[in-house]
From Swiss-Prot:
Keywords in alphabetical order: Cytoplasm, Decarboxylase, Lyase, Porphyrin biosynthesis
Complexes and interactors: Homodimer.
Gene of this entry: hemE
The name this protein goes by in its record: Uroporphyrinogen decarboxylase
Organism from which the protein derives: Colwellia psychrerythraea (strain 34H / ATCC BAA-681)
EC number in record: 4.1.1.37
Biological processes, Gene Ontology terms: protoporphyrinogen IX biosynthetic process from glutamate
GO cellular component assignments: cytosol
Amino acid sequence: MTELKNDTYLRALLKQPVDYTPVWMMRQAGRYLPEYREVRKNAGDFMSVCKNAELACEVTIQPLRRFPLDAAILFSDILTIPDAMGLGLYFETGEGPKFERPITCKADVDKIAVPDPEDELGYVMNAVRTIRKELKGEVPLIGFSGSPWTLATYMIEGGSSKAFTKIKKMMFAEPQTLHLLLDKLADSVISYLNAQIAAGAQSVMVFDTWGGVLSPRDYNEFSLQYMAKIVDGLTRHNEGRQVPVTLFTKNGGMWLESIAATGCDAVGLDWTIDIENAKARVGDKVALQGNMDPSMLYAPLPRIEQEVSKILSGFGEGGTGHVFNLGHGIHPDVNPDHAGHFIESVHRLSKPYHK
């Protein structure tokens, strides 16, 4: 495999010395870029881009042509696993993802099997291999999956939800059924991420988008314990390097200590927690990723720069162990020039912290 020309992102995740704070953006390959919209229009729909290795590679690399990002992230969707389990994923305009056959009872859970990542999810592995080849060692490639809890919310609700009543009904009325599903999903995520690593992903991330809707007790029982199982089951060395693992629970700021105790290398932060506070609590154990509010990219350029400066100074001296990112995905109507200024500001303003 090609030697990495820029491994700053991987080194920061492992709390090794770096010359500046690395940066990438959640959803950096996406609708805010006109070149992405063009590919998507020609492909017909979102999953057609995901399932074509050349198109997935093209959109993964598009933001790297514009910006000096320190990592590429596989262009895919968190719902590939439930789709491969036969739930019938489809997208309604303006409605987001939906499933034709949601999970409603134990019989539904018994029917689904752990997908073979090189068979039903082979298109994802083909995309990983294609992207790695195309990157030519410029920057590392991040693989990812949804967390078992977050995948289960879509599978049981049948799509997005505001109140999560269907999954919470199962959680409180039939907890053993939900645990059975979450356990199958954890096994699926382990095999899926390990296949991505074998195909060339140099770091992996688990997105627990909906963990923050749970009480502390339920978060530990229904979300975190399954992410801990995943961390335990992952390949942590490949191609002569450590493969860092990042866990990200949106609205999970109150549980940082528990997340850090899973054995992950890094914890993702959203903007609802102060990075200085997060570092004081868990910075000795894990690296931190985040955490600018993505809506800050609507602000005038000097305001964006001011926010970057505030977050960098919040993380402070002894600057390794921080990967700069947004606290969630970049919004589709953001001006790409604002994203570019954000990235340039992180690189320029972070250098004094790494002398």
